Amino acid sequence: MMCSGYYNYDTPYTPEFAGQQDFQGQVVHPQHWPEELDYQDKQVVVIGSGATAMTLVPSMAEKAGHVTMLQRSPTYVASRPDQDAVANTLRKFLPGSVAYAITRFKNTQMQKFLYGKMRAEPEKMKKVLVGMVRKALGPKYDVEKHFTPKYNPWDQRMCLIPNGDLFKSITAGDTTVVTDHIDHFTT
């Protein structure tokens, strides 16, 4: 087993950006989210495209005026249902612990299979993953720029989004993805 960590929960890494001291908006680190944060009808920028951003962006877009997800480079993103139909069916007929064990086995085997497939046939699986995003966002969306990484699937961690909510937020016009570097903050 190998485990690694790269941050301290109490003092998360927060990069500094030119112009940040003059920025008049509020800067929030999601690790220490203020409960009273009011972003209703505001223009929000989420910096990053990791797992936190992938769930934060569509959720915030429900209340914000608009949310922009700013990323330096794309991440592989796959949508999957937030409910497991097999697990839900098994729980109707089996004790919870048995249903859990079967579901856990099914999910770990599926993950092993998909991981192996992506490592064995990276170009083919890259086309599948990018094709799913293209199908969700439509032919006019620049999937190459915003959702096609330069690396192979699982060279870096992939992000799963529940029920395609990020894609729905983008197609609804509530969210924009920008792939670029931050030069400086403006007021």
Predicted regions and their residues:
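A conserved short coil-to-beta-strand element within the FAD-binding core of flavoproteins
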Residues: 33-36, 146-151, 158, 175-187
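Long, low-complexity segments enriched in small/aliphatic residues
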Residues: 130-133, 158-162
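Short histidine/acidic/glycine/proline-rich micro-motifs that form metal-
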Residues: 119-120, 153-156
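Generic low-polarity alpha-helical segments
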Residues: 1-2, 185
